[in-house]
Amino acid sequence: MASTPRAKTFKSPTKTPSNIYRKSYLSPSSTSHTPQTPETHTPLRRSARHVSRKIDLGNDPIDAPGNDPIEGMNLIRKRERAPRKPTTDVVPSKSKKTETPKKKKKIDSFTPVSPIRSETIKKTKKKKRVYYNKVEFDETEFEIGDDVYVKRREDSNSDEEEDPEIEDCQICFKSDTNIMIECDDCLGGFHLKCLKPPLKEVPEGDWICQFCEVKKSGQSQTLDLPKPPEGKKLARTMREKLLSGDLWAARIDKLWKEVDDGVYWIRARWYMIPEETVSGRQPHNLKRELYLTNDFADIEMECILRHCSVKCPKEFSKASNDGDDVFLCEYEYDVHWRSFKRLAELADGDSDSDQEWNGRKEEEVDDSDEEMELDDEVLKSKRGGLTSARGGANSRKGRFFGVEKVGMKLIPEHVRCHKQSELEKAKATLLLATRPKSLPCRSKEMEEITSFIKGSISDDQCLGRCMYIHGVPGTGKTISVLSVMKNLKAEVEEGSVSPYCFVEINGLKLASPENIYSVIYEALSGHRVGWKKALQCLNERFAEGKRIGKEDEKPCILLIDELDLLVTRNQSVLYNILDWPTKPNSKLVVLGIANTMDLPEKLLPRISSRMGIQRLCFGPYNHTQLQEIISTRLNGIDAFEKTAIEFASRKVAAISGDARRALEICRRAAEVADHRLNTNKSAKNQLVIMADVEAAIQEMFQAPHIQVMKSVSKLSKIFLTAMVHELYKTGMAETTFDRVATTVSSICLTNGEAFPGWDILLKIGCDLGECRIILCEPGEKHRLQKLQLNFPSDDVAFALKDNKDLPWLANYL
């Protein structure tokens, strides 16, 4: 195949920070219809920028075999599978100095992959890479997140055409610096003076050229299109080549240099024109509209022609005079599911959230690569100076677990217009949604989890193991496991730990316990099926050892939070999940998390035996640990007095030891202090003091429902205490009246209180249900009536712990 010489240097258009949405929340859509593009947000294009296009109003998709654009591109890929020629070093040799003219370098090694579906290239040896955030290449600066034109190898002749900086007028076929207007239909450029009648200025609103108006009126037979002068060669712009399918557009996801041969590469995330989608170009598609895909490819930087600019609808509507290389992107297109997804409007973030639905997982590409930390060096290429920047992709390792999937939403300008005070920084840092940089006070537990997982996946056989993690709420069980998995992911990228696949499931998100089969199978295979079919396929994989794809060869780590919610009448769900790791070659590691300590003892013997003896207890935090957690969050922020932090820590440690409650009290105390300082401008103490913490505690623990608990009858207090005690014993939020009545009888007998009887207890439970202190079913179910606390158990403990009439209640709370 003929190679394409590099295009001449072209000045990159001005880049804007809001080039395109930096992060997307992706999930295959259930519909395959092309979504409508709202005209209110993306008006039709009209501008005075220099544009040109042949007057062609065809709206049909690109012709391909079977009218399927993806099948058509498959024919192209057959020509790309030839073995690549070895690349040459871009650094010029210093030993030879001759005056002979240099020959143009052939770029047979350039292999931009089809944006329909990338071909995963198997690597035969490990390659060392140096990653960058920004490089200067051919006197043009490229950085992660830029949008660029990319050469299309299968039609290399189109890339060799001249790229005019100023396009020709569609009437006089001359290019000059006079103002031109763009037709919103055909995107053709016209001089104002060449129009009939001529225009003195660019009109407001939509503008359609006279030729398009004639075509729309149905009189195309009488249309006399202008013809270029004889010998005049019409040069197409990059925009025309892209929209006609002769070029590709991509977003730079990574930048690196191969240390072995010195060639610079990028990871490109492809854009797609509407004609290349399954629906083709629809009437509602704008002429400059592109779709961001979930398809990636690694290509050499020599394939890049120059910058373009892909904008969100809001920025696109303001880009009337930003040049010809401006495009709109409002939707993402899943090339595997052939579905559309509206892009979330996010700002300057990494595009990491698409890892769940990428057809080409990143670990499949980078597991064999040995990444190197970037050193200070001046890089030079054959084209010119190439400068490096510190950081790059090396700073983004291990980034797909847990709450790190959550993106940063766009902050309004009025919020960012002033400098944050210390109290405002403290309030933002103490939010429960804020992920801490480090996790203090749990290093011992994290080391034990790490050694357990490494020991489970390091063996080639990987027979499978189970670990049960338990502890009261708010003790850091889940976040500790997620932090361990994040660190292990970084070690996988470095090559010190063998690759694995990780599946995280929360029992609270399951409609029924059996749905966990469908969730596991979908996470492993990407296909959504019913739970019975999923159970059959999972049995074939874990029990019978059938392997389907490459992912099946990797060990699987399954994290199940709220494990106790999977308990059914016959306990078959837990039995199946815990039985799989015992099978030969299952390569399954199960981590179960629950609040109750003795859950294995409450299960059937066949299940508790499979759960194993590997258990890890997360005890409640004491006041010293809570103080360290809060101080770590507030590191570098001088907003709290030390006595205020200590007071909040001791108060929470005496009740429950819940770190989340301590953080919430401190955050509320910061809000109280901020209000106090705004009210009293002359206040000398600008920090959060003990009085602010006390006010926050009183506000939190003196809510109306707590006052109701304090004022109920003695038997009602015993009833609530029995419900809390039953919750601590079983770890189940939901219980039955039969169990609560049995617990009340035991408590009364132990402490010398007269048992009131079942009928009176039933009436007490119904009365508490009417007050909405508890949630209960109708009373006619009697012993089988289901009960559940409507508020946290900590609130019940706080309300009843210091009761003077029944001081022994504190022993059960």
Curated annotation (Swiss-Prot):
Zn finger spans (PHD-type): 166-215
One GO BP: double fertilization forming a zygote and endosperm
SMART domains (alphabetical): AAA, BAH, PHD
Tissues in which the UniProt entry reports expression: Follow a cell-cycle regulation with a peak at the G1/S-phase. Mostly expressed in flower buds, and, to a lower exent, in roots, leaves and stems.
Amino acid composition bias (Low complexity), ranges on this chain: 27-41
Basic residues biased stretches: 43-52
Function comment: Essential protein required for ovules fertilization. Component of the origin recognition complex (ORC) that binds origins of replication. It has a role in both chromosomal replication and mating type transcriptional silencing. Binds to the ARS consensus sequence (ACS) of origins of replication. H3K4me3 effector that positively regulates the transcription of a subset of genes.
Listed name of the protein: Origin of replication complex subunit 1B
PROSITE patterns for the chain: BAH, ZF_PHD_1, ZF_PHD_2
The keyword Magnesium is assigned to this record: yes
Assembly: Component of the origin recognition complex (ORC) composed of at least ORC1 (ORC1A or ORC1B), ORC2, ORC3, ORC4, ORC5 and ORC6. ORC is regulated in a cell-cycle and development dependent manner. It is sequentially assembled at the exit from anaphase of mitosis and disassembled as cells enter S phase. Interacts directly with ORC2 and ORC5. Binds mostly unmodified histone H3, and, with lower efficiency, H3K4me1 H3K4me2 and H3K4me3.
Name of the encoding gene: ORC1B
Record flagged with keyword Metal-binding: yes
UniProt-listed InterPro entries: AAA+_ATPase, AAA_lid_10, ATPase_AAA_core, BAH_dom, BAH_sf, Cdc6_C, ORC1/CDC6, P-loop_NTPase
Location of the motif Nuclear localization signal: 83-90
Binding site for Zn(2+) 2: 169, 172, 191, 194
Native species: Arabidopsis thaliana (Mouse-ear cress)
BAH domain segment(s): 226-344
